């Protein structure tokens, strides 16, 4: 992980070129000082990186489901610390759209997983009520519903923190302003203000428009922005001896009243206007809206434009109490699942089959980047078929005007979130039908087109015969075994990062002797600081990664000893690393050791030798050029 982090930091132009870094479910999202210093093409070819996307003012590196681990490694390697998670105070670069997407993604990205979790929990509770497994009066329901509803009820406080960080202000000051919006005294004043004989509320004689700000989104975002501006001015003007407490004091005294008097009513009016406008457009042509959103959603995601729609969805929940956009996106997700399953069925390469299968599984839960970038998009036609299938499914859902009643990532869980308080109705069944059509059409279309293209290839003229150059070990520069032990097929390795082949083709060994010896003549290209992995580049350009054990990076070098340094010249059979097998096993780690060809894409194929047991120095892999 550390080696991948080093390559990523180098690929984005070095630590000094990083302004800020955050991550979502599958991507590292960099804000760079100078994007021209980034080496996108180099990063795209780096094992462990699925894709690189430059969009929305961000340099995005698509990693996959283990992005959180890579984020921590990059943070450590680059020495970013808190800077990695904070936004710059001002971002004046890029066009208006890029700046908008950058701000919105920074505010909502940290909350997406939690919002999805609370949405799923609400859907499960709705399902339980529908089948009468519980009642609204039961303690179990009340406690779990409180957990599912708390995030949105106190949204102004939570968004105060993320918006405060994004705008470069003190996030805790913005949180307090958000807390004022949903304080019990304010909510009580709002309820009393609904009565016919209620007296109005004023601030220093200025009348206050009483509104319910629970679950609101836009007011606190504007307030956090204003607060950050005032805070910077005050920090510049006030003496350092008093600004630590006078700055937040003055911000609260100024911004809180301004929020209640001006920002809150104005932004609430804007929220209602946006919701009414969206509802009018949607109700005018719901089926067409479904076709557009279902067909183009994944394209929006590729370019990072989907972040501009997240506030719209959340605003719909705040103003309308439901959202009609998320149901339209669910078929787009299901279609990517179907296309990936089609590739899984048709693919003959065992490792690529594993990649397609695991990508389809993660897509079911709304994480489509592995399926899009690792499976469907590189093959082109599965991605196109998935977009068309998503449009078909979403057209049906749009026609039925299906709604969801809680926020969540478009996924298999969306079906539960479409259940209204009155129970399962036609709109729920429409979402099921739309999802099934999307996944079914994408699967069938991908399989059919695969067989059609496979039949046409021989008719295009027989290709010229080319005898592949096979490098067999050890005489002709092939790969010898670096260990003595039992051969394990790569697809049986417990870590899917290795098993999927994303880091390169190869084989694994369960060692019986605690030594790693050089499999080739060459030089040491890399040696991890924790000594659990080493990279060797052979004299004829084959790059080999030997990773001793699974998750052994957590040992932090304990039980490992290195006998070489980076840059050393080595011969076949030279001792590279020693390790204590009993101690590592006693610590609870799997010693299965992947031996990978990192630059597998440079060769026609990498073939393991068929043997169950092997000794160090015996033939292990053949490279076909």
From Swiss-Prot:
Signal peptide: none annotated. It is an enzyme of class 2 (transferase). Pfam families: PTS_EIIA_1 (PF00358), PTS_EIIB (PF00367), PTS_EIIC (PF02378). One of its GO terms (molecular function) is protein-phosphocysteine-trehalose phosphotransferase system transporter activity. GO terms for biological process: phosphoenolpyruvate-dependent sugar phosphotransferase system; trehalose transport. The keyword S-adenosyl-L-methionine does not apply. Residues 1-84 form the PTS EIIB type-1 domain. SUPFAM superfamilies: Duplicated hybrid motif, Glucose permease domain IIB. Residues 121-140, 188-202, 266-284, 346-353, 402-403, 453-625 are cytoplasmic. The EIIB domain is phosphorylated by phospho-EIIA on a cysteinyl or histidyl residue, depending on the transported sugar. Then, it transfers the phosphoryl group to the sugar substrate concomitantly with the sugar uptake processed by the EIIC domain. The EIIC domain forms the PTS system translocation channel and contains the specific substrate-binding site. This is PTS system beta-glucoside-specific EIIBCA component. It comes from Escherichia coli (strain K12). The gene is bglF.
